[in-house]
Amino acid sequence: MKITQEEVSHVAKLSKLAFSPEETAEFATTLSKIVDMVELLNEVDTEGVPFTSNVAANINYMREDVAQPGWNREELFQNVPEKERGYIKVPAILDDGGDA
């Protein structure tokens, strides 16, 4: 399956990433090769092989949910670079609008 440069550019835009035309072409080629390798798995004969969703015998061990004391607020706020109205202020990672 061929991944086009347009598809790579579209996903990059949705991910807020910017690539040069050379990088976009390289990603398209590499991703196409990866998809081709994964598609080879469709040719594997699995007749008679039992379905397994997990080969390890995992067991969920539950514990009682007990509230524990949290951080000392004053001590915590001594270690933050910026605070505003009782909250820790962090840099914005999302802008207004966009396709995503």
Curated annotation (Swiss-Prot):
Molecular function as annotated in GO: asparaginyl-tRNA synthase (glutamine-hydrolyzing) activity; ATP binding; glutaminyl-tRNA synthase (glutamine-hydrolyzing) activity
Keywords tagged on the record: ATP-binding, Ligase, Nucleotide-binding, Protein biosynthesis
InterPro entries in UniProt: Asp/Glu-ADT_sf_sub_c (IPR036113), GatC (IPR003837)
Protein's UniProt keywords contain Nucleotide-binding: yes
Class of this enzyme: ligase
E.C. numbers: 6.3.5.-
GO biological process: glutaminyl-tRNAGln biosynthesis via transamidation; regulation of translational fidelity; translation
Catalytic activity entry: L-glutamyl-tRNA(Gln) + L-glutamine + ATP + H2O = L-glutaminyl-tRNA(Gln) + L-glutamate + ADP + phosphate + H(+); L-aspartyl-tRNA(Asn) + L-glutamine + ATP + H2O = L-asparaginyl-tRNA(Asn) + L-glutamate + ADP + phosphate + 2 H(+)
NCBIfam families per record: gatC
Family per record: Belongs to the GatC family.
Subunit structure, interactors included: Heterotrimer of A, B and C subunits.
Matches recorded under HAMAP family: GatC
Biological function: Allows the formation of correctly charged Asn-tRNA(Asn) or Gln-tRNA(Gln) through the transamidation of misacylated Asp-tRNA(Asn) or Glu-tRNA(Gln) in organisms which lack either or both of asparaginyl-tRNA or glutaminyl-tRNA synthetases. The reaction takes place in the presence of glutamine and ATP through an activated phospho-Asp-tRNA(Asn) or phospho-Glu-tRNA(Gln).
Protein known as: Aspartyl/glutamyl-tRNA(Asn/Gln) amidotransferase subunit C
Species: Streptococcus gordonii (strain Challis / ATCC 35105 / BCRC 15272 / CH1 / DL1 / V288)
